[in-house]
Amino acid sequence: MASEKSHKVHPPLHFILFPFMAQGHMIPMIDIARLLAQRGATVTIVTTRYNAGRFENVLSRAMESGLPINIVHVNFPYQEFGLPEGKENIDSYDSMELMVPFFQAVNMLEDPVMKLMEEMKPRPSCIISDLLLPYTSKIARKFSIPKIVFHGTGCFNLLCMHVLRRNLEILKNLKSDKDYFLVPSFPDRVEFTKPQVPVETTASGDWKAFLDEMVEAEYTSYGVIVNTFQELEPAYVKDYTKARAGKVWSIGPVSLCNKAGADKAERGNQAAIDQDECLQWLDSKEDGSVLYVCLGSICNLPLSQLKELGLGLEKSQRSFIWVIRGWEKYNELYEWMMESGFEERIKERGLLIKGWSPQVLILSHPSVGGFLTHCGWNSTLEGITSGIPLITWPLFGDQFCNQKLVVQVLKAGVSAGVEEVMKWGEEEKIGVLVDKEGVKKAVEELMGASDDAKERRRRVKELGESAHKAVEEGGSSHSNITYLLQDIMQQVKSKN
């Protein structure tokens, strides 16, 4: 802590953090809260009671260590919008029908939050809000304080969205959803289909109104915090910073603030496996021999595809950990595993985690040599930070952009071969995109002994080392937190 004290800011700034209610958005925001508090700022996190419970243990340890972090609860108006009680996080829903009322309920938090802000002591200096909570812009305007947007994705994807929003005619002129187009004015030559990019061109009604409000709130914000580091995507950090008139702070990988084993194990939620049991299993395997498989907290693959994934892992003859989140939704998968003998056949070299996994803890273990991921930005960054090459299996959102960065630009992974977006409600119709032979082939390509595989491992190990240097004192991300604190302090002083 001695090195951090030299950077503390006095009098302390007070940051109000608004994480969106989705695991992939909340987890890095909690890490950001700890990073700011370690540098002397007071931090208040505003969320609902149910969501606060997900990171209670991690924050309790942070507070007990003396970090000035507070949590303030607001009531989630589930009844008004016909939502089930206790389902206050987007990963609790598996149908698009409830998404619009969920977002409407989230937007209704504006009034109670406004009242909270009026009573808050010390006076807030700055809001850091998730992109998906545009109402926080009104609050920032009312209290005349800067609002910084947190996206939860990297600069490659942010620049891609920025460029395409200014060239919508490219998307509108495509004759088919299967046609590829070239992203204009981009540092690298990259191509996508229209469904693969997170830029909406056909929204209507309430959903379009929300998206328009979100984009406006983003572009009128004071600046952007990004969970990335300059050495990972230098051209994209540079161009996106230029596009946002300089107010972009790359402060990642924020997951590296989790140094204690307990913090790594409980990051985001209570793990569905005992930490010691997991480590004991990993300790029994050779270095670099285990493939970690996790397709995120909102994985919506159909049963037919999950069976092929399991059979492909079995055929690869590699040791693996397979995480199946939302396990309660997969009774049929469990029946298949038992009746077909799958669980019995793989018990010596396969570990199934049925629920939330201690991902950072697993990825930082020397036995792990590969990561099959849905390419959510947190997972992508956690894999690279741990020096682990990736098999990319994107589902939706920013994940196809992240795949392109990993495979084509960074050359830190191989694609499983998925080209079609997994649309909510149409999973069964889409069916199997990668069969067991395709899974086996991707695992062999990643974990094998070819020159390409060796070069990929060398490259990603180098990126992992750069990530750790970035967050150390004097590193790019550590310095960017200093610049952020100095900037907000100047804003506070100019108003006094």
UniProtKB/Swiss-Prot annotation:
It comes from the Eukaryota. It is an enzyme of class 2 (transferase). Its EC number is 2.4.1.-. InterPro entries: UDP_glucos_trans, UDP_glycos_trans_CS. Keywords: Glycosyltransferase, Transferase. Residues 450-475 are annotated as: Disordered. UDP-alpha-D-glucose binds at residues 297, 357-359, 374-382, 396-399. Residues 451-472 have a biased composition (Basic and acidic residues). One of its GO terms (molecular function) is glucosyltransferase activity. It holds the Pfam family UDPGT. Belongs to the UDP-glycosyltransferase family. PANTHER family: GLYCOSYLTRANSFERASE (PTHR48047), UDP-GLYCOSYLTRANSFERASE 73C3-RELATED (PTHR48047:SF229). This is UDP-glycosyltransferase 73C4. It comes from Arabidopsis thaliana (Mouse-ear cress). The lineage of its organism: Eukaryota, Viridiplantae, Streptophyta, Embryophyta, Tracheophyta.
